[in-house]
Amino acid sequence: MPLQAIVSFLRLDIAAGVILVGAAVLALIAANSPAAALYEQVFQTPFVIGYGPWLLEKPLLLWINDGLMAVFFLLVGLEIKREVRGGELSTPRLAALPAVAAVGGMVVPALIYASLTWGDAFALRGWAIPAATDIAFALGILTLLGPRVPISLKIFLTALAIIDDLGAILIIAFFYTASLSPLALLLAAACLALLIGLNLSGQRRLWPYLLIGVVLWVCVLKSGVHATLAGVVLALTIPLGATDDESASADKPLERLEHGLHPWVTYAILPLFAFANAGVSLAGLPPSALLAPVPLGIVLGLFLGKQIGVFGFSWLAIRSGLAPMPQGARWRDLYGVALITGVGFTMSLFIGTLAFETSDPLAADFGTEVRLGVLSGSLLSGVIGYLVLRLSRRNPATE
């Protein structure tokens, strides 16, 4: 990723972090105010899209979680494709450290959560909740430190978060998929074949891809696979480079779409998702509520699991010679970044909605516990990580 692109990206992400915090705070205020009933009612209001026999009716909350979040995953897929084809994940040497760190940051938190909920099969469904990292929040916190943090650490965290997102995509596909509809899957496969055909034929206009992508989203939604995965599939078929008869400076389809989506995802979709899902009523919750297995597993997974997994696996990779230390970074810097990866927020909340998205009466109670655990664990990780990096970088580093 070019340096200027990283700088522009981080400027967006510091603003994104502030807006996401604001959205979460507003959600908490709404859920604990006289407007709490209205807050719940608004997001349960059914909305119908379509015409005649082609109608889709869902509560507003599900349009946000299944529809708008598919656009977020489209952006994630574009970032993954760009980095794998020509960025920070394009060679084994470049990808080694963030890949190993991301694996540790997913495995250890999941094991901690599972160890605390092992006796409850329903609670165990949330094992992947603390395995996620919110890239906008994490990079926003890192950017607050300015030149104290070397650019190599910011690149490392960006690559780690992208691999973490890829892991979340695979988790959703394999572990949070309901019963499947063969016909809908067949139609989705036909859409994928059309998208691949467009790519191979050299089509560089975006509208045919996006039009088929909408149909693909409907097919995936009806198939039983989570609809957000349609965004990832669409992203992988968007052409990366310009054609041979275009100049090197010509706009590339993937870049055009990525740059067009980033502000919408940053300033609209993720804040709306946070506002819709972060509201947790604290009324009647005793101080011991955080000690229940689900919230405790999430808090410990995000705060302890992430730092142990990311830092521990990074230490092994560097000491073994598998990967180099990020340029200009020190061990305590890497530890601070490992702490910041415990900010799961939107991604953890999203996986939580999938884990307990059932008609079981227990799901509502677990939903509250998930939000409580995610907000607490993310806050703890973000604050402590920021303080560690600030103290370890009192003198600004040269970038």
UniProtKB/Swiss-Prot annotation:
Annotated organism of origin: Rhodospirillum rubrum (strain ATCC 11170 / ATH 1.1.1 / DSM 467 / LMG 4362 / NCIMB 8255 / S1)
GO molecular function: sodium:proton antiporter activity
Pfam families in the cross-refs: Na_H_antiport_1
Name recorded for this polypeptide: Na(+)/H(+) antiporter NhaA
Alphabetized InterPro entries for the sequence: Na/H_antiporter_dom_sf, NhaA
UniProt membrane topology term: Multi-pass membrane protein
Function text: Na(+)/H(+) antiporter that extrudes sodium in exchange for external protons.
Localization per record: Cell inner membrane
Spans through the membrane: 12-32, 60-80, 94-114, 126-146, 155-175, 178-198, 206-226, 263-283, 284-304, 336-356, 372-392
Keyword DNA repair recorded: no
GO CC entries: plasma membrane
Main subcellular location: membrane
Keywords, sorted A to Z: Antiport, Cell inner membrane, Cell membrane, Ion transport, Membrane, Sodium, Sodium transport, Transmembrane, Transmembrane helix, Transport
Known catalytic reactions: Na(+)(in) + 2 H(+)(out) = Na(+)(out) + 2 H(+)(in)
GO terms under biological process: regulation of pH
Family: Belongs to the NhaA Na(+)/H(+) (TC 2.A.33) antiporter family.
